[in-house]
Amino acid sequence: MTTAAIIVAAGRGTRAGGELPKQWQLLAGQPVVARTLAAFRAAPGVHRTLLVIHPDDRARAEALPDVAEGTVELVEGGASRDASVRNALEALAGRGVKHVLIHDGARPLVAQALITRMIEALDASPGAAPAVPVSDALWRGEGGRVVGTQDRTGLFRAQTPQAFRFEAILAAHRAHPGGAADDVEVARAAGLEVAIVEGCEDNLKVTYPGDFARAERLLTARPAP
């Protein structure tokens, strides 16, 4: 049984500040995406890893050790996130992949235990996604003022890697018109059941400048491998 990981790193996000997209900025001396790749390369249940990049980032990507050594395959992304994922899925078609994990390149702190849980969840469901229950109070705002509250019962903060049986999510992407926020949306549009798996608070997506400092603190607190 072959499990592939797709690391989506084709975005041009600038909210993190700096001259480079967030996935190429340094985190404790390494590009964010290099740390993300390392997590999946070390996962015993992952047999193949694809990195989806923007064409302008090819030189940076080819300089990554995992890419230079041939252990990670590059795929150029599309005009949107779902188009980028579709390109990677098509690159895996016909190559004997049973399961696929789709992960944000800007989530470098994904834990091995979470990767394992996601793969195992596919024994019982065609799709699975990690999530953390919403614990903060939720407000509705208008014009800079609070105008109401929102019941948080049953609400979750979505994370990645989102896991799917390969042929099911490939068919779902081929049928989807585009514009999905994530792969769970694509899967559900195709009628696929998606199980919720316990996520991890440390599995943050590096998005804003302050996220780098938090991620470095979390890395420092981790035991040495």
UniProtKB/Swiss-Prot annotation:
GO terms for molecular function: 2-C-methyl-D-erythritol 4-phosphate cytidylyltransferase activity. It comes from the Bacteria. It catalyses: 2-C-methyl-D-erythritol 4-phosphate + CTP + H(+) = 4-CDP-2-C-methyl-D-erythritol + diphosphate. The record marks 15, 22 as: Transition state stabilizer. One of its GO terms (biological process) is isopentenyl diphosphate biosynthetic process, methylerythritol 4-phosphate pathway. Keywords: Isoprene biosynthesis, Nucleotidyltransferase, Transferase. The record marks 152, 205 as: Positions MEP for the nucleophilic attack. Pfam families: IspD. Its EC number is 2.7.7.60. Pathway: Isoprenoid biosynthesis; isopentenyl diphosphate biosynthesis via DXP pathway; isopentenyl diphosphate from 1-deoxy-D-xylulose 5-phosphate: step 2/6. InterPro entries: IspD, IspD/TarI, IspD/TarI_cytidylyltransf_bact, ISPD_synthase_CS, Nucleotide-diphossugar_trans. The keyword Nucleotidyltransferase applies. SUPFAM superfamilies: Nucleotide-diphospho-sugar transferases. Catalyzes the formation of 4-diphosphocytidyl-2-C-methyl-D-erythritol from CTP and 2-C-methyl-D-erythritol 4-phosphate (MEP). Belongs to the IspD/TarI cytidylyltransferase family. IspD subfamily. This is 2-C-methyl-D-erythritol 4-phosphate cytidylyltransferase. It comes from Cereibacter sphaeroides (strain ATCC 17025 / ATH 2.4.3) (Rhodobacter sphaeroides).
